[in-house]
Amino acid sequence: MIDFGNFYSLIAKNHLSHWLETLPAQIANWQREQQHGLFKQWSNTVEFLPEIKPYRLDLLHSVTAESEEPLSTGQIKRIETLMRNLMPWRKGPFSLYGVNIDTEWCSDWKWDRVLPHLSDLTGRTILDVGCGSGYHMWRMIGAGAHLAVGIDPTQLFLCQFEAVRKLLGNDQRAHLLPLGIEQLPALKAFDTVFSMGVLYHRRSPLEHLWQLKDQLVNEGELVLETLVIDGDENTVLVPGDRYAQMRNVYFIPSALALKNWLKKCGFVDIRIVDVCVTTTEEQRRTEWMVTESLSDFLDPHDPSKTVEGYPAPKRAVLIARKP
């Protein structure tokens, strides 16, 4: 059973303590009512993993843990088998005592694009919305963050995060909660809020931006990464039934339109810091994610288009401040 008691104890002593008015009841309800049919199997996998204190831990350049003495072949095989029980692995990569988890996404590429434009993360309390398996939270800790809190309702991601945490010596500087942002009160407590790969899945993108703003302290920083299309400040794509085979894509604005949306929600100092086309080198099928990936979602005769005929995925990073 995954226990959230450590997180409750941690925030009871800091400026997130008011979250305890609602959070334990929400988590208790989730534990009682909303667990996935495979959750017990996934959480048992986490239980079976050894808790190892890394001799060398690198979260600054990667997510890499090494022991002082190499693990035996049997120990490595056990860890690899258990981690494979938590497939598919989408966000990473992770290198854990000789087990190299080559995830669908090279999430380190995205981090390298984002990091140079961030305010110094040293000592910051961070919220990562739609955090997946938590890869970027560990990189935030590596960049000096005091505490990284991730929210993502996908329960496999929670178990993947807890598995990695256990292999990082039960590190308590990052925590993942199985919630969506709509379940959070207006905490106004985070120095930096990340929303990466979420906005286009929201039926009301401006409401999402307001929800992000409600989590920030005054003068806090928003890091927004999402799909965009080419065009002026009035250009927005509303896909039909699917976009790149995804059913739940609602609005894809141009970067300039997105900048206007942020302005409309009261953000200031809005910057478009990166725009790049997603390549099949960055997102692809691997041994750790064996189903369809980006190459299957693009027109085989024209990779500049999706199979539905829309522009192929292009992503922008915008940074803004809450006044």
UniProtKB/Swiss-Prot annotation:
Enzyme category, top tier: transferase
Key word Repeat present: no
Domain of life of the source: Bacteria
One Gene Ontology term of the molecular function aspect: transferase activity, transferring alkyl or aryl (other than methyl) groups
EC number: 2.5.1.-
Role according to the record: Catalyzes carboxymethyl transfer from carboxy-S-adenosyl-L-methionine (Cx-SAM) to 5-hydroxyuridine (ho5U) to form 5-carboxymethoxyuridine (cmo5U) at position 34 in tRNAs.
Family: Belongs to the class I-like SAM-binding methyltransferase superfamily. CmoB family.
Subunit-structure text: Homotetramer.
Protein name: tRNA U34 carboxymethyltransferase
UniProt organism field: Shigella flexneri
